[in-house]
Amino acid sequence: MSRRRHSDGDDGGQSHKRRRTSEPVEIEDRLESLICRVGEKSTSSLESNLEGLAGVLEADLPNYKNKILRILCAVARLLPEKLTVYTTLVGLLNARNYNFGGEFVEAMIRQLKETLKANLYTDALYLVRFLCDLVNCHVIAAPSMVAMFENFVSVTQEEDVPQVRSDWFVYAVLSSLPWVGKELDEKKDVEMDRLLNQIDGYLKRRLKTHVPMLQVWTAEKPHPQEEYLDCLYAQIQKLKKDRWQERHILRPYIAFDSVLCEALQHNLPPFTPPAHMPDCQYPMPRVIFRMFDYTDAPEGPVMPGSHSVERFVIEDNLHNIIKSHWKERKTCAAQLLSYPGKNKIPLNYHIVEVIFGELFQLPCPPHIDVMYTTLLIELCKLQPGSLPQVLAQATEMMYVRLDTMNTICIDRLLNWFSHHLSNFQFRWSWDDWVDCLALDADKPKPKFVKEVLEKCMRLSYHQRIVDIVPPTFSGLIPADPIFFYKYQDEANSALPGYAVAIAVGNAIKNRASNEEILTVLKDVPNPNQEDDDDEGEGFNPLKIEVFLQTLLHLAAKSFSHSFSALAKFHEILKALTDCDEGKLHILRVVYEVWKNHPQMVSVLVDKLIRTQIVDCAAVANWLFSPSMAHEFTRFYVWEILHSTIRKMNKHVQKIQKELEEAKDKLERQQHKKQKDSGDEEDMEKNSEDEDGQLEEQIERLQEKVESAQSEQKNLFLVIFQRFIMMLTEHLVRCETGSVDFSTPWYKNCIERLQQIFLMHHVTIQQYMGTLENLLFTAELDHHILAVYQQFCALQL
């Protein structure tokens, strides 16, 4: 069917004439297209399109009522940016067909209950807001909406429920008031005052332990980093003070007031929020990201204040556009730039602030990080005359505020910035950042510039970075990524193992077998063994050094050469690292030879884990070891650690999935056996054999899951134990020397601890009891314990 016709917004009459000759499925597709695309570009006004579409749908109700109901319920949930367009459409249909209006309201309430039970809280929020706007369209009676809100707010009186549950229901009420507050206040002012007083009381007694963990900046100037409910409540208070006058929401139903006010209204059925269950996963609290105010956009329209409800509405709509179109960057960018009412606001500033707000959202952004990079690149292409300047202004602001920026967000900023530069020939006014050269190397600004250049080098090559950066920045340019092979120079021939290294190199070049190479390696003296020691050889660090340095030296040409070398000599590497000390030492050797090439270190460690030459706990122990202390605050170290944790988590999930699938298969077989119980005996015997095999498989998988979970728990114990030891030593040392403990290193370390909790919160929650009993006890220094308490508060 032609898609071109669907874009005609004013073809109501024509489509009705053609409908009789169409197939039912084709008509249903056409109805869906007409509904989904109403309000998009058209030669006619939105009002005439809505009136025409209402006429088409009314005529189709006798045959396609259920389909129309399903589509309208779906768009209420999936296209929140067009909410008022669809509420007006439903209002027009209700005015023409009262029974349909009632059925739609019932269907929406059913859908709301289902989404809440399924933990789909964002969808539920859109449905609540849609129901609210139906009050404006004279579909739902205002008193029944107030009654629903009262039931929502009553959740704050429940005992023994997580705070995040009450938070969601309060947020659902407050975030709907910009749309419906005026109507409800006019009809039920006493009840609305009482409702807001109850919310006020709840917000005053609400715990906010979690806030420091979620703030992008620790400083409150120039913009306070407010908790999301506090900020929204302040916006609603100002809206109420302004007599609920809001000027930014598109309200197409006003044009149909004379028709809609004649319609009969429906009462919402009594709505009781579903009870709290242990498996409920409520949305985490947030902190509202602020980067700009009216002083940053001096020309053009004025940016609404942070406590103006217009700011909330604009940001909410922009978030909704990103949520609806994030998989298609071109569409997403075009939709953002064609935002309704764009001439009344400094749109570019709002878009940039919203995008960075999502990118820096803690614990994790709503979408993958690279999406925001590609979206900003697309926006720069579409608005080359204005958006790049706003983006540069934002980058400069973030650079200036690096000292108080959360380390997790600095990671995301440098990833975005380096990727962005790589798409624009690495052009940047580096001289504007010359102030960082006068600071200590461990301060956030020089550290940020150095890490950005390191990341840029990954996306190009060393000489390119040398060429693009002013000579004054030479101290921050990454080192040339060369390989350090200590057995290369004949001047080092006196080194222990030198002769064997030469022999191993020749053996590898001559395609010697693993056995032959192991025979050559037997000549390597063991520095850990006394001359008169008659026992077995044990752990020999020199043997690992001689073999691995030589192997990686011969394979140093590229990543793929190195991967092939590790794969080819996997058996030897496994033999050399059969103990924990061996695993640690192989990691040390990888770092020693490639210390000027962090990316190579990262990918080789990744390969060693994948091929099970080293385990995840060994990587954690190595990263926290004294030999890596000087690298502890480097970006790539944390890249390796988080990658290691993710691998462990995926491994556990994979085995758990296999176990669940085996259990499901057994259940299906047993169910089938019960159904076919009248069949022959030999079939029964085969079935029993299959059941027995599956039961054995389930038992084996159960053991594997328990073993993997034990490894996973041990990995987190190792990581948190090392953090506690390092931070405690630092705090004691500072207290003993009477110096301020709050150094750049301390800020980095404590925020890296927060990062572990935030990035892996779902997994860590399984082991809270163990962590509390063994590590995060009451005796722990309160600075460290505070991080754990903030984490616990995220889901309380």
Curated annotation (Swiss-Prot):
Protein's cellular compartments: Nucleus; Cytoplasm
Annotated spans, Disordered: 1-26, 664-695
Residue ranges occupied by any MIF4G domain in the UniProt entry: 28-240
GO molecular function ontology, one term from the record: RNA cap binding
Database matches in InterPro entries: ARM-type_fold, CBP80, MIF4G-like_typ-1, MIF4G-like_typ-2, MIF4G-like_typ-3
Gene Ontology biological process: 7-methylguanosine mRNA capping; mRNA export from nucleus; nuclear-transcribed mRNA catabolic process, nonsense-mediated decay; regulation of mRNA processing; regulation of translation; regulatory ncRNA-mediated gene silencing; RNA splicing
This protein's GO CC annotations: cytoplasm; nuclear cap binding complex; nucleus
Keywords (A to Z) from UniProt: Coiled coil, Cytoplasm, mRNA capping, mRNA processing, mRNA splicing, mRNA transport, Nonsense-mediated mRNA decay, Nucleus, RNA-mediated gene silencing, Translation regulation, Transport
Major localization class: nucleus
Composition-biased stretches (Acidic residues): 678-695
Role noted for this protein: Component of the cap-binding complex (CBC), which binds cotranscriptionally to the 5'-cap of pre-mRNAs and is involved in various processes such as pre-mRNA splicing, translation regulation, nonsense-mediated mRNA decay, RNA-mediated gene silencing (RNAi) by microRNAs (miRNAs) and mRNA export. The CBC complex is involved in mRNA export from the nucleus, leading to the recruitment of the mRNA export machinery to the 5'-end of mRNA and to mRNA export in a 5' to 3' direction through the nuclear pore.
Family: Belongs to the NCBP1 family.
Protein name: Nuclear cap-binding protein subunit 1
